[in-house]
């Protein structure tokens, strides 16, 4: 239990370091990812106006569990919603998570459909 708390604290510190460097605008919003034990939450955020442009939750896709298949479907869905709003360029905010596995699959799927970051 204590190991989980420490790893979550390290992730939060990593995310704070990242957030100091990246800012989303209206032309290039921030693609923010949060992964819990059971689901993904992805948002396109305009930090200047402090609004969410669009969001996707892993419950919106028809797959159970938190696996690479779900991450791929969620990445495709956020790309479709962004392209429908005319957003092509985004700033990728991995939320302090390591760029590996599910996060990498989500990023690759959204790139494949046309998002550029």
From Swiss-Prot:
Keywords: Ribonucleoprotein, Ribosomal protein, RNA-binding, rRNA-binding. It comes from the Bacteria. One of its GO terms (biological process) is translation. Part of the 50S ribosomal subunit; part of the 5S rRNA/L5/L18/L25 subcomplex. Contacts the 5S and 23S rRNAs. HAMAP family: Ribosomal_uL18_B. This is one of the proteins that bind and probably mediate the attachment of the 5S RNA into the large ribosomal subunit, where it forms part of the central protuberance. This is Large ribosomal subunit protein uL18. The lineage of its organism: Bacteria, Bacillati, Mycoplasmatota, Mollicutes, Acholeplasmatales.
């Amino acid at each position: 239990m204590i190991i989980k708390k420490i790893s979550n604290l390290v992730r939060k510190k990593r995310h704070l370091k990242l957030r100091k460097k990246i800012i989303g605008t209206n032309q290039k919003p921030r693609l923010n990812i949060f992964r819990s034990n059971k689901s993904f939450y992805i948002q396109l955020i305009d930090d200047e106006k402090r609004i969410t442009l669009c969001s996707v939750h892993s419950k919106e896709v028809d797959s159970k569990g938190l696996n690479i298949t779900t991450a791929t479907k969620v990445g495709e869905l956020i790309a479709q919603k962004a392209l429908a709003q005319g957003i092509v360029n985004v700033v990728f905010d991995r939320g302090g998570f390591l760029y590996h596995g599910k996060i990498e699959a989500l990023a690759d799927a959204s790139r494949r459909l046309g998002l550029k970051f």
